[in-house]
Amino acid sequence: MALTKRIIPCIDVDLNEDGEAAVYTGVNFEDLEYTGDPVELAKKYNEAGADEFVFLDITASAEGRETMLDTVSAVADECFIPLTVGGGIRTRDDIKETLRAGADKVSINTGALQRPELIGEGAEAFGSQCIVISVDARRRFDEAGEHYVEVDGESCWFECTIKGGREGTGTDVVEWAGEAADRGAGELFVNSIDADGTKDGYDIPLTKAVCDNVPTPVIASSGCGSPEHMAEVFEDADADAALAASIFHFEEYSIEETKRSLDEQGIPVRL
């Protein structure tokens, strides 16, 4: 029997002008617009039948500040499905405090790329199942990469970026995903800066490149505009889970109708 695919709503959280946590959505990691309250959205998705929930503090790493753990704790109080929290996690103590605040898993991007040993430290202390390595990938059409795919008739590779997509690293996503898995990551969270917020569909070449080369479970993220896009990333790239934000936040589709649509298309989901 095929493994059940997971449907995961995600909130991108930042501090507003009053220093309060708020949810935002944007396009290509830019042009952010206020979307809602993180605690209210957590409660909504918990009751709606989501399989998991992701909370990303989208400026903690770039601003060099700590993750907003008070908000994480408030979200965890309303969330009785697995909760993954990312943003600003740089040390083993950061992992511990985030889990203590109520997270079931932590998502690490910048901190792991800057110090890869953090992956093994976290996996050894808390278990691989708690360690999700996030990659914010950007397409590069040059000869600096290692793993190339064809996109619209051109050869490209995918570069890992850090600090919310603000800085390139020169590191190939597929190479890094393999290293992260070898170091103890229990899951990979693959974001596409090029697809983010477009609602044109997931970056299939990116997701497939990671899934084909790394045995660790992969969460596909960025670009979802419909349940059909989720079906594509499950069938064409073999992702284990699909993450979406805007289509759920703005109630273009509910979790329930998304799952029913996938079920009708033969995708195994938890109804």
UniProtKB/Swiss-Prot annotation:
Enzyme Commission code(s) on record: 4.3.2.10
UniProt-listed CDD domains: HisF (cd04731)
Active site: 12, 136
Keywords: Amino-acid biosynthesis, Cytoplasm, Histidine biosynthesis, Lyase
Tagged with keyword Chaperone: no
UniProt catalytic activity: 5-[(5-phospho-1-deoxy-D-ribulos-1-ylimino)methylamino]-1-(5-phospho-beta-D-ribosyl)imidazole-4-carboxamide + L-glutamine = D-erythro-1-(imidazol-4-yl)glycerol 3-phosphate + 5-amino-1-(5-phospho-beta-D-ribosyl)imidazole-4-carboxamide + L-glutamate + H(+)
GO MF annotations in UniProt: imidazoleglycerol-phosphate synthase activity; lyase activity
Pathways per UniProt: Amino-acid biosynthesis; L-histidine biosynthesis; L-histidine from 5-phospho-alpha-D-ribose 1-diphosphate: step 5/9
Subcellular location: Cytoplasm
Highest taxon of source: Archaea
Chief location: cytoplasm
Listed GO CC annotations: cytoplasm
GO BP terms: L-histidine biosynthetic process
The protein's enzyme class: lyase
Pfam families in the record: His_biosynth
PANTHER family (alphabetical): IMIDAZOLE GLYCEROL PHOSPHATE SYNTHASE HISHF, IMIDAZOLE GLYCEROL PHOSPHATE SYNTHASE SUBUNIT HISF/H IGP SYNTHASE SUBUNIT HISF/H
Subunit description: Heterodimer of HisH and HisF.
Function: IGPS catalyzes the conversion of PRFAR and glutamine to IGP, AICAR and glutamate. The HisF subunit catalyzes the cyclization activity that produces IGP and AICAR from PRFAR using the ammonia provided by the HisH subunit.
Family, per entry: Belongs to the HisA/HisF family.
Family annotation (NCBIfam families): hisF
Name assigned to this protein: Imidazole glycerol phosphate synthase subunit HisF
Species whose genome carries this gene: Natronomonas pharaonis (strain ATCC 35678 / DSM 2160 / CIP 103997 / JCM 8858 / NBRC 14720 / NCIMB 2260 / Gabara)
